[in-house]
Each structure stands twice: as C-alpha cells, then as structure tokens.
C-alpha cells in the first residue's frame, strides 16, 4: 500500500483512515471513482498470476484527453484525502491519451478510445482473469 509519507507529503496533512484497503478493495475503489467521472468500459485485471510488480490493473476509457485528466485527478484526490493513498508515479498527463497512475498494488490506465484500441492491453494480457465490478451503493 502506498504511504503518503513515502511520497514526500507530511503525514499530518491527512485524516487517519480506520484501516488499510486490500489491493482488491483499492482496485474496486479506483474503478468506482473512475466511473464517477464517467469513465467507460472499466475493467479490473488480476495481474498476480502474470507479473510481480503489481496485483491489479484498472483499465478505463475517457472520451477525450481532458476527461482522462479529470478521471486521473478525481482518483488521485479522493484516494489522497479519504484513504491516505498516493500514487508512486503518474505518467502521460501532458498528452493525456494514455495516463498511467502507479499505486504499487494497483496500476490505473486511463485511455482515450483511440489509444485503448491501439495498445489493446486486454488482449496483451488476455490470459489473466478479470474481476467483476460490484455495483456502486446508493
């Protein structure tokens, strides 16, 4: 789990969370936060059988680069303030056709439709299981 103090942020700026999220809970939380900013085709891939550097990929589509940035920002801000979780690294925000946010246990991939069709991560990792998204309560 990413600790805010590891990223150079003073720990005192964050409210105390009652418990840490498991990697699967974090993946589902990220997926639902992306959906809240109208991301489409949200998929969670269980990467544990295939790679050692992360547990899950969350892959989603934004209508355009502006929405890709908005999704990335929403996830980052909500996790930062509500769960005390920060990404270790974010790349691709300038062009915003494929933004990758590395939360260590979970990697968020936000694509524009063209970039998602071009890179086809689901096909590349077609042998790993996908995780069902639970309905958002409320």
Predicted regions, residues:
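Mid-chain, well-packed structural core segment of small domains
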Residues: 78-107
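Long, contiguous binding/interaction regions
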Residues: 1-44, 48-49, 63-70, 91-93, ...
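Short amphipathic alpha-helices in soluble, non-transmembrane regions
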Residues: 71-76
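P-loop NTPase catalytic core of nucleic-acid-dependent motor ATPases
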Residues: 52
């Amino acid at each position: 789990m990413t600790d805010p103090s590891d990223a150079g942020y003073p720990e005192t700026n964050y409210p105390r969370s009652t418990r840490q999220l498991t990697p699967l809970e974090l993946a589902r939380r990220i997926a639902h936060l992306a959906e809240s900013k109208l991301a489409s085709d949200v998929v969670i891939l269980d990467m544990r059988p295939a790679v050692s550097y992360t547990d899950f990929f969350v892959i989603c589509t934004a209508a355009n680069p502006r929405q890709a940035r908005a999704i990335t920002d929403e996830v980052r801000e909500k996790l930062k303030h509500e769960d005390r979780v920060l990404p270790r690294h974010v790349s691709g925000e300038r062009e915003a056709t494929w933004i990758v946010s590395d939360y260590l246990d979970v990697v968020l991939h936000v694509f524009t439709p063209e970039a998602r069709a071009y890179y086809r991560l689901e096909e590349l990792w077609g042998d790993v299981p996908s995780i069902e998204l639970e309905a958002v309560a409320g």
